[in-house]
């Protein structure tokens, strides 16, 4: 007589499988972050797993085509390192925006960022480093506080007050510097202005000595798909940011009206 699996047993297997998936993704993340081949022990130490467990995960990733071995070292395959096809909307947006970003950087000096909105997440799609001695570092995952960053304000301006409340939590909002807007009414009033005018600023609100200005990239539906941002030391902003704003708005208008990548991004995001 056939044995019918118990509900508890099926749930336990699902939990085990999801745990293995999370550990495998963590291993891939460490390989990407290292930017060099890693030994089994290096990977195991970095993810906090026993070498035997890590070895089984790497074998599974190898069989699935996500890692390969170079002697005793492990490396990500092209499938893992470059998962997006060349014609993916994010890659198309990067290519369409690159000449405009270089022109903005050369004209004004600060770094230029192209940021995409994926739900309530922000991703740096491309960057052009500014003209200053300290090389800036921009992570793919944008973690700057929503209420104290240009990309965050543009994203929040695209949300309802109720959605903003869920994203920000209760006021007063955390202070990053003495210039951070912490009051709910003051911040929401600024966000409404950002929505109307299409651009946002950060004047020493996240890091003292760093300012930024940026404009939204807009889907045909009117929703924001991302932002273009000029950011750098406050000395670039001593004479104000109107010239930067004007050029950013022109660049965004050009992309919004002519770039098929912006339309493709709106389809990709479902907005």
How would you label these PLM feature ranges?
Residues 2-91, 253, 257-261:
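N-terminal helix-turn-helix
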Residues 197, 208, 225-271:
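Juxtadomain coupling helices with adjacent low-complexity linkers
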Residues 218-224:
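Flexible loop/coil segments at beta-strand boundaries within sensory signal-transduction domains
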Residues 76-170:
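Amphipathic alpha-helical effector-binding/dimerization core
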Residues 106-107, 204-209:
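Short loop/turn motifs at secondary-structure junctions and domain boundaries
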Residues 208-216:
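A short beta-strand signature within small-molecule sensing/ligand-binding domains used
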Residues 2-5, 134-206:
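Short, solvent-exposed recognition segments
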Residues 30, 95-107, 113, 193, ...:
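Amphipathic alpha-helical regulatory segments at dimerization interfaces
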């Amino acid at each position: 007589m056939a044995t019918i699996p118990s509900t508890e047993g099926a749930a336990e297997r699902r939990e085990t499988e999801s745990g293995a998936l999370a550990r495998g993704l963590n291993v891939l993340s460490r390989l990407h972050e290292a930017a060099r081949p890693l030994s089994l022990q290096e990977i195991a130490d970095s993810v906090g797993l026993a070498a035997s467990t890590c070895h089984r995960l790497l074998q599974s990733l190898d069989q699935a085509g996500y890692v390969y071995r170079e002697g005793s070292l492990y490396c990500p395959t092209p499938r893992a390192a470059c998962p997006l096809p060349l014609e993916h909307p994010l890659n198309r947006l990067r290519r369409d925006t690159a000449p405009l970003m270089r022109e903005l950087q050369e004209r004004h000096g600060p770094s230029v960022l192209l940021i995409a909105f994926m739900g309530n997440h922000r991703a740096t799609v491309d960057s052009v480093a500014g003209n200053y001695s300290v090389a800036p570092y921009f992570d793919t995952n944008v973690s700057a506080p929503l209420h104290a960053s240009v990309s965050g304000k543009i994203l929040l301006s695209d949300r309802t007050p109720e959605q903003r409340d869920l994203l920000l939590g209760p006021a007063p909002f955390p202070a990053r510097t003495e210039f951070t807007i912490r009051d709910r009414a003051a911040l929401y009033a600024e966000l409404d202005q950002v929505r109307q005018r299409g651009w946002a600023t950060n004047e020493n609100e996240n890091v003292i000595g760093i300012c930024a200005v940026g404009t939204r990239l807009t889907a045909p539906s009117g929703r924001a798909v991302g932002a273009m941002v000029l950011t750098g030391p406050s000395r670039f902003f001593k004479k104000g940011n109107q010239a930067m704003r004007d050029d950013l708005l022109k660049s965004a208008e050009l992309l919004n009206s002519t770039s098929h990548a912006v339309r493709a991004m709106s389809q990709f995001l479902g907005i």
